[in-house]
Amino acid sequence: MKKHPNLLLGFSVYLSAGTKLTIPPEAEQHTAPSDNNKRKRAKCDDPSMIKITSENNKRTRATCDDPWMITITSDNNKRKRAKYCDDPDYDPDYVKKLKVYKVLKL
């Protein structure tokens, strides 16, 4: 408990009014790191490592193994555009109709 003076002071709320807590001087020297210091990124001076990391991130974002997921996402975006579109002639399923027409035409 010597390293946690704030915990001791918070606990003093539950003690009776006449109780006094004394914190030893060693405990006051210890300070806990703030949340900002915990999550700092490690600095890297090697530019080749930064390049490799950015290339890996690009590859991760660019690849999608399931073509249906790409179609579903694009269809959802078309529906959103159609919902807020002022053009009465806009048809979100226009691309699908073209694909079906091309298949039937062949």
From Swiss-Prot:
Keywords: Signal
Signal peptide: 1-22
Domain of life of the source: Eukaryota
Residue span of region Disordered: 23-46
Keyword Signal: yes
Name of protein: Uncharacterized protein At1g24060
Organism ancestry: Eukaryota, Viridiplantae, Streptophyta, Embryophyta, Tracheophyta
